[in-house]
Amino acid sequence: MAGTKNKTRAQAKTEKKAAIQAKAGAEREATGVVRPVAKTRAKAKAKTGSKTDAVAEMKAVSKNKVVAETKEGALSEPKTLGKAMGDFTPKAGNESTSSTCKNEAGTDAWFWAGEEATINSWFWNGEEAGNSFSTKNDKPEIGAQVCAEELEPAAGADCKPRSGAEEEEEENVIGNWFWEGDDTSFDPNPKPVSRIVKPQPVYEINEKNRPKDWSEVTIWPNAPAVTPAVLGFRSQAPSEASPPSYIVLASAEENACSLPVATACRPSRNTRSCSQPIPECRFDSDPCIQTIDEIRRQIRIREVNGIKPFACPCKMECYMDSEEFEKLVSLLKSTTDPLIHKIARIAMGVHNVHPFAQEFINEVGVVTLIESLLSFPSPEMRKKTVITLNPPSGDERQRKIELHVKHMCKETMSFPLNSPGQQSGLKILGQLTTDFVHHYIVANYFSELFHLLSSGNCKTRNLVLKLLLNMSENPTAARDMINMKALAALKLIFNQKEAKANLVSGVAIFINIKEHIRKGSIVVVDHLSYNTLMAIFREVKEIIETM
């Protein structure tokens, strides 16, 4: 692009010089036709129009003539100039010079020929037409350049050179105007667009909001006194992980009296030091720091004057009276629950929340709400308190268990035979009879139990046998089982149709009774009863061996 541009510019300058010299000769021979015409047109334009229009007309005429010369010369004589280039040698130099001078008159006549409208339309076709013209007619341009170089000595001998001012004017009109416009349109090295970063505004500390003494500074619970964020010491570091924050709004004197010395002086790992700023509010609200003294004074002003002097940025209002406020302060000193402190801050108007939440707290009553929360702890804590602080005495517990066993025995016997309720009661009684203490209660219902054993189904018999097996381990209860009715009912279960589990339980009952008699735990005084008992044992033994 740059090489083609320089080549075209050099060619235009050469053609311009040839045109100037030819034009000077034509002025001498043709009595100066060009300049009078241009001046006449300029004067006519100056009379009818402004000076600006005259200058533009003169520049347009000069441009049209130069371009017409370039176009006509390149189109009409490509072959002649090509031959002149091919035959141009050091020996034939003089001949070509003479032939060039002979054609000078014809060139002058051709130079001023042409139609102005055609030249104007061709000249303003744009860069595309100029580029295609230069590439297609490369050889004719070279021929025209050689011809112009040979015309220079011939015309220079006969013609007078033009002044420097006129040449500079032509240069400004044609060369500089054309190429400067091209350079301006296409910048090879555009400047990058940079982003302007505006500095962040620096907020100055408002001296009016600074507290006068430490009594106006908020005291946070379980932590040393810190300066609130409204004083200007805002945190620039990322927020650290901290436990749930809550505020006990109190003055320095009240907080020093309410907090023990060990709590105030002991450094905590989770608390912040005095030099560390208060963390930002976690909710979508601006923190509003007010002391209890300020809120108390504002409530008194409102009660006396009937106005609302609250000018805090959160635009929340405190709807409590002085009596309710003092009760709330006393409740806050007795607890450190974060939920209760947050509810208190909402009621005091120092924590910005949804209006519905504040309206709910104000309608219910903040004191009533906090008292109910303090009176009803969590279910786990309440259950633990019942077990640890109010344990029942041994006699009371034993009495309740005896009542429960009697109640279960009555209900079990009252249910229909083989009913689910009866079977559930037998299962519970089997669990209760694992302890010998309650055997004397169940022994009162032996007749009903042996009736169920003889008339119940397989599952009912299984539950009754488990209960009797537990009772047979106790010598006192086993003594009550040694009678003809009970032993006859036990002997009936030993048959081929009985379940194996029931047979095992029946054998275990007889073994327990035999062991009690052998050890002397059970003494049989009546020989008739003893003989009957031994006969039943032999019969049961034979049945078991047969099975």
UniProtKB/Swiss-Prot annotation:
Gene3D superfamilies: Leucine-rich Repeat Variant
Keywords: Cytoplasm, Nucleus
Induction and repression of expression: Down-regulated in colon cancer cells, due to CpG hypermethylation of its promoter.
Ranges of compositional bias, category Basic residues: 1-10
An example Gene Ontology molecular-function term: protein homodimerization activity
Major place of residence: cytoplasm
UniProt cross-references to InterPro entries, sorted A to Z: ARM-like (IPR011989), ARM-rpt_dom (IPR006911), ARM-type_fold (IPR016024), GASP1-3 (IPR043374)
Assembly behavior: Homodimer.
Protein name per Swiss-Prot or TrEMBL: G protein-coupled receptor associated sorting protein 3
Species of provenance: Homo sapiens (Human)
Native organism taxonomy: Eukaryota, Metazoa, Chordata, Craniata, Vertebrata
